[in-house]
Amino acid sequence: MARYFRRRKFCRFTAENVVEIDYKDIATLKNYISESGKIVPSRITGTRAKYQRQLARAIKRARYLALLPYTDNHQ
């Protein structure tokens, strides 16, 4: 059996000393949304609880203002 090296998860917002996550920063928010449009959980991204709450709030605000989609593009 081949074992693989699991990369250590870390909070990007803590490393960059981010004070608050902005809902207008669409490029950052898109990294934390799945293909289907759902918010990716912190156990997968490695984001701390404080920033995960801010992230969820920012994504929901961006969705409300139509900056981000609620779901994927149906075809």
UniProtKB/Swiss-Prot annotation:
InterPro entries: Ribosomal_bS18, Ribosomal_bS18_CS, Ribosomal_bS18_sf. One of its GO terms (cellular component) is cytosolic small ribosomal subunit. The modification N-acetylalanine is found at A2. SUPFAM superfamilies: Ribosomal protein S18. GO terms for biological process: translation. The keyword Lipoprotein does not apply. Gene3D superfamilies: Ribosomal protein S18. One of its GO terms (molecular function) is small ribosomal subunit rRNA binding. NCBIfam families: S18. Binds as a heterodimer with protein bS6 to the central domain of the 16S rRNA, where it helps stabilize the platform of the 30S subunit. PANTHER family: 30S RIBOSOMAL PROTEIN S18 (PTHR13479), SMALL RIBOSOMAL SUBUNIT PROTEIN BS18M (PTHR13479:SF40). This is Small ribosomal subunit protein bS18. The lineage of its organism: Bacteria, Pseudomonadati, Pseudomonadota, Gammaproteobacteria, Pasteurellales. The gene is rpsR.
